[in-house]
């Protein structure tokens, strides 16, 4: 069992586009550990790369984490004792510390131009040199001395001076003792005065009291650099937990360029339940609570969470498994609760305008409440409910009869339709049971037609398709007048063919 002193964890995304699903993946384990230990979970915005900032990205980060139930205890939005929580608002914090590193001999200014660095890389590649890092041309030089040599630029960057005896091993909460490759002289302050990730993350984590750093395994190679910065600045280093990377089904790293599911907003747009996605992300790196028991709420997960149980294998992000899990969550919801979730989704996504060509009316909402039990068992996503129920919300005269469904009706469909209309006209009790009993008696018992063939024309007439939610319950919801109007309209249509 890992030490349970109150931990301070953080997730630190960059607002450079749609939030990545990896942000939620890390935030899940950050929040779980903070909650498990009675600590705090912090959201920090790392916006030092000014060239890649995207408008609205920061707001989307707040919205998606809130939607997932992973809201932080401290953030730029809610504040906290360690404000500001945006790196761009902390620039005055970094520069004095960079100067301190220069004065102590742990860092140096570099005036090499981008052209010179590119040439260095090309020459090494041509010579098949194993060297990949900076060649320290500027080390020990003044600006005036460096200006006399080729490839000079007026505004310098600042680089770490990595010692020969740098310790490459460190302890990881998930992986035990880890050995990383030797780092090069990393830039820690850019020419524009902004710190790089490596400098800013160390400074911010220390000053915000972050004692448990949860991040992807791609940062293992950077950890020796970060530990050096902690050492040089005289600070205690945090504990590190390097999570396994999310992988596509072909085992490649999941990315927004190749996989739409890498976009965190995509799950909300598609109609996934946040609790299902959260549960799914948990299962990617943590064992189930019991054999065959995949569904687990967040509080239960928190109560048994320990870093020693996190998997180190590359979890495969298989949306098919998420679809199954989301369907399980949908079917676990009470029909009234599910209806509210469906309507909230439809309102947020303006779905009715795409499905019906208009907004939902109050009458529509009442119909959806009544009809939700008919489709609950058939749903995988919230987005599927409205299209499945659209026939109940369509004007009788506007219902479109699917051509393929009409074409597949067997001979005698017109006779079935005539008989069904006459039976339904005489019904006073228009409940689902009464409708079924009357139609079965006339079409199956008297006319000798098999139920599947007998009810197919009725289904097409009422719903527009051969595939629909339960027919008789749908007819009850439509009511006698609307049902007969549709059936008579369809009767007239097939009479013309």
From Swiss-Prot:
Biological-process GO terms, alphabetical: glutamyl-tRNA aminoacylation
Residue ranges of the motif 'KMSKS' region: 253-257
Motif 'HIGH' region, residue numbers: 13-23
A GO CC term assigned to this protein in UniProt: cytosol
CDD domains reported for this sequence: GluRS_core
Class of enzymatic activity (EC top level): ligase
Location of this chain's protein in the cell: Cytoplasm
Family annotation (InterPro entries): aa-tRNA-synth_I_cd-bd, aa-tRNA-synth_I_codon-bd_sub2, aa-tRNA-synth_I_CS, aa_tRNA-synth_I_cd-bd_sf, Glu-tRNA-ligase_bac/mito, Glu/Gln-tRNA-synth, Glu/Gln-tRNA-synth_Ib_cat-dom, GluQ/Sye
Name the UniProt record assigns to this protein: Glutamate--tRNA ligase
Native organism: Cutibacterium acnes (strain DSM 16379 / KPA171202)
């Amino acid at each position: 069992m890992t030490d349970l002193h109150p931990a301070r964890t953080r997730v630190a995304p960059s607002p450079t586009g749609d939030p990545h699903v990896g942000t939620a993946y890390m935030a899940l384990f950050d929040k779980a550990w903070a909650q498990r230990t009675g600590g705090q979970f912090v959201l920090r915005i790392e916006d030092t790369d000014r060239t890649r900032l995207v408008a609205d990205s920061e707001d989307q980060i707040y919205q998606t984490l809130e939607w997932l139930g992973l809201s932080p205890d401290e953030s730029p939005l809610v504040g906290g004792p360690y404000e500001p929580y945006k790196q761009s608002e902390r620039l005055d914090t970094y520069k004095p510390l960079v100067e301190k590193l220069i004065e102590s001999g742990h860092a140096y200014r570099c005036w090499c131009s981008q052209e010179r660095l590119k040439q260095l890389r090309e020459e090494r590649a041509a010579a098949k040199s194993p060297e990949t890092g900076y060649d320290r041309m500027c080390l020990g030089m003044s600006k005036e001395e460096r200006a006399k040599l080729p490839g000079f630029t007026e505004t310098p960057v600042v680089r770490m001076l990595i010692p020969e005896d740098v310790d490459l091993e460190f302890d990881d909460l998930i992986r035990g003792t880890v050995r990383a490759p030797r780092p090069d002289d990393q830039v820690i302050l850019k020419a524009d005065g902004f710190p790089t990730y490596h400098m800013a993350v160390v400074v911010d984590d220390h000053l915000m009291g972050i004692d448990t750093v949860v991040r992807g395994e791609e940062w293992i190679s950077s950890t020796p650099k970060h530990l050096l910065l902690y050492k040089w600045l005289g600070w205690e280093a945090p504990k590190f937990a390097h999570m396994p990377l999310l992988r596509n089904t072909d085992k490649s790293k999941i990315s927004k360029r190749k996989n739409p599911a890498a976009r965190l907003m995509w799950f909300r747009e598609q109609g996934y339940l946040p609790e299902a996605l959260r549960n799914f992300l948990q299962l990617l790196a943590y064992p189930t609570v019991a054999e065959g028991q995949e569904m687990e709420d967040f509080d239960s997960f928190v109560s048994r969470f320990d870093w020693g149980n996190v998997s180190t294998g590359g979890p495969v992000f298989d949306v098919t498994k998420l679809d199954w899990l989301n369907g399980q969550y949908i079917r676990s919801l009470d029909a009234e609760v599910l209806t509210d979730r469906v309507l909230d989704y439809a309102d947020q996504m303006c779905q009715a305008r795409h499905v019906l060509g208009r907004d939902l009316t109050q009458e529509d909402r009442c119909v959806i409440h009544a009809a939700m039990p008919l489709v609950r068992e058939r749903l995988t996503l919230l987005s599927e409910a409205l299209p499945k129920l659209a026939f109940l919300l369509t004007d009788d005269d506007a219902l479109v009869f699917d051509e393929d469904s009409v074409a597949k009706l067997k001979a005698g469909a017109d006779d079935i339709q005539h008989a069904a209309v006459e039976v339904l006209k005489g019904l006073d009790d228009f409940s689902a049971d009464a409708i079924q009993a009357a139609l079965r008696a006339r079409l199956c018992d008297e006319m000798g037609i098999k139920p599947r063939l007998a009810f197919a024309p009725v289904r097409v007439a009422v719903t527009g398709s051969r595939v629909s939610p339960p027919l008789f319950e749908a007819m009850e919801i439509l009511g006698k007048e609307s049902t007969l109007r549709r059936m008579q309209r369809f009767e007239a249509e097939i009479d013309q063919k």
